[in-house]
């Protein structure tokens, strides 16, 4: 799942686990992060730019077609797949998280790393002093989506419908969705705010949005 919502949520959970934020993140050109890869002027996904501003980190996109500039992350994924997953079963996601946390702290983080020749947890203990502090108030993370107002004065997002003022029928608007709230914008101004629907087919309607 490389949706923007999942991408941002993974960042939040990682930063909370570390208890701090790296000052610079090297990012491969996944669409949930970089909408246009470019050597000199990459286009950052709008919601991800807001995340970076809220946490204070800098986004450093990898140059396209230059594998030498990428962070060495694939090897870590391969290590987890080969050493953690094969011999285990999980009741649910919470059980998986509890098991992997114990594995990192008692096994994976204490091994001698094949490249650095240092235990990963020892490296992290040294690096932690260089990290940024978490913000006192976590940023309100949300994803942006282009929407068009239907003739019934609603916009559609993830198979749910949200009303906007009837004068905007036919207009192209922007919708920002957080885990709890959906806000619709016209000309950079909010025109409607709704609690986020939880079921496909739900309608969130404000009577004042409808024509008299």
Question: Each predicted region: which residue ranges?
Answer:
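Active-site beta-loop-alpha junctions of metal-dependent nucleic acid enzymes
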Residues: 1-21, 198-204
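A short, flexible beta-alpha/helix-coil linker loop
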Residues: 29-34
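Two-metal-ion acidic nuclease core segments, chiefly of the RNase H-like superfamily
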Residues: 41-59
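Active-site-proximal acidic segments at structured loop/helix or strand boundaries
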Residues: 77-176
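Protein C-terminal end segments and domain termini
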Residues: 179-212
């Amino acid at each position: 799942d490389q949706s923007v919502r999942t991408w941002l949520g993974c960042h939040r959970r990682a930063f909370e686990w570390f208890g701090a934020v790296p000052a610079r993140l090297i990012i491969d050109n996944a669409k949930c992060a970089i909408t246009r890869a470019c050597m000199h002027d990459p286009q950052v996904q709008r919601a991800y730019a807001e995340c970076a501003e809220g946490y204070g980190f800098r986004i450093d996109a990898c140059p396209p077609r230059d594998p030498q500039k990428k962070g060495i992350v694939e090897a870590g994924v391969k290590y987890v797949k080969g050493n953690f997953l094969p011999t285990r079963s999980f009741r649910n996601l919470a059980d998986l998280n509890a098991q992997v946390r114990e594995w990192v702290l008692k096994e994976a983080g204490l091994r001698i790393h094949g490249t650095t020749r240092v235990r990963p947890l020892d490296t992290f203990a040294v690096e932690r002093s260089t990290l940024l502090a978490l913000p006192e108030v976590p940023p309100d993370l949300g994803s942006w989506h282009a929407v068009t107002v239907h003739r019934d004065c609603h916009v559609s997002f993830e198979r749910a419908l949200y009303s906007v003022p009837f004068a905007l029928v036919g207009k192209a608007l922007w919708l920002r969705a957080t885990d709890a709230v959906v806000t619709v914008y016209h000309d950079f101004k909010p025109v409607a705010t709704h609690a986020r629907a939880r079921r496909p087919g739900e309608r969130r309607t404000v009577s004042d949005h409808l024509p008299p």
